[in-house]
């Protein structure tokens, strides 16, 4: 049975002030998988993510989310596309003066016509799904970094998106908290049938959560390897893969 393609990136090229950052990138993301965009600093990971969610238009190419063209969409079509995905940026970006409940309510108030009580109940359910039941009236400053990340994921899930984009979700977390967040991501993907697209450079997280990986390289300006993470590490003869894993091992050591 053919897998459902939820994201299709075709001949994608990104440029900034005349300089090409990524060139002729092609890949698909399948529904229900955890898909990781891996690479070192400056390779274009976050640039690719920002184009995928429609913040920028590529120099060339197409990006389809659930069949809708992010690049060619008009205003109404873009609003429809926005409902299909949620985003958690690296900072988490919770509003510090608002409770967790109010933070999670924001997308529902902005993009739906639901009555206040229905919005409140949905927001409470999202907090429960990320392990934050009972913390709805807490301010972000009262929570640990890991709990703030969970709250940011809950907000990104508010509209029941088909895809969640996470930019370096483990950034700033200690190894134990990072592992707990990995477990949450896998649980959400499997139990809620959600698709995750994650930008990361951390190997431990990748092997814990990823179904498939693409590896970007700054010099090549594109994909140098793609596949299941353990296959890349254990069986690949790709020199770019070996170099990346060797560099990461030395940093971890």
Each predicted region: which residue ranges?
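Catalytic Walker B motif of ABC-type/P-loop ATPase nucleotide-binding domains
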Residues: 164-167
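Conserved ABC ATPase signature
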Residues: 139-143, 147
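A short, proline-enriched helix->beta-strand linker immediately N-terminal to the Walker B motif
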Residues: 158-162
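Conserved beta-strand-loop-alpha-helix hinge in the C-terminal portion
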Residues: 219-245
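Helix-to-loop junction immediately C-terminal to a conserved catalytic motif
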Residues: 53
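ABC ATPase NBD coupling module
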Residues: 70-86, 116, 232-236
């Amino acid at each position: 049975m053919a897998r459902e393609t939820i994201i299709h990136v075709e001949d994608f090229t990104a440029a900034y002030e005349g300089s090409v950052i990524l060139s002729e990138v092609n890949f698909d993301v399948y529904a229900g998988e955890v898909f990781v965009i891996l690479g070192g600093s400056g390779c274009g990971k976050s640039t690719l993510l920002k184009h995928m969610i429609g913040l920028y238009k590529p120099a060339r190419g197409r990006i389809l989310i659930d069949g809708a063209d992010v690049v060619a969409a008009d205003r109404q079509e873009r609003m429809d596309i926005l409902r299909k995905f949620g985003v958690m940026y690296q900072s988490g970006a919770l509003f510090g003066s608002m409770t967790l409940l109010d933070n999670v309510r924001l997308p529902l108030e902005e993009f739906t016509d639901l009555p206040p009580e229905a919005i409140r109940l949905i927001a409470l359910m999202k907090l429960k799904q990320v392990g934050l039941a009972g913390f709805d009236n807490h301010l972000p400053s009262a929570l640990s970094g890991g709990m703030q990340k969970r709250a940011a994921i809950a907000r990104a899930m508010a509209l029941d998106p088909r895809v969640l984009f996470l930019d370096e979700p483990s950034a700033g977390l200690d190894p134990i908290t990072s592992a707990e967040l990995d477990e949450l991501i896998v649980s959400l993907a499997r139990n809620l049938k959600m698709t995750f697209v994650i930008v990361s450079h951390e190997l431990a997280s990748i092997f814990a959560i990823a179904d498939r990986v693409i590896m970007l390289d700054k010099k090549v300006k594109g994909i140098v390897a793609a596949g299941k993470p353990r296959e890349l590490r254990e069986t690949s003869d790709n020199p770019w893969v070996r170099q990346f894993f060797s560099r990461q091992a030395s940093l971890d050591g």
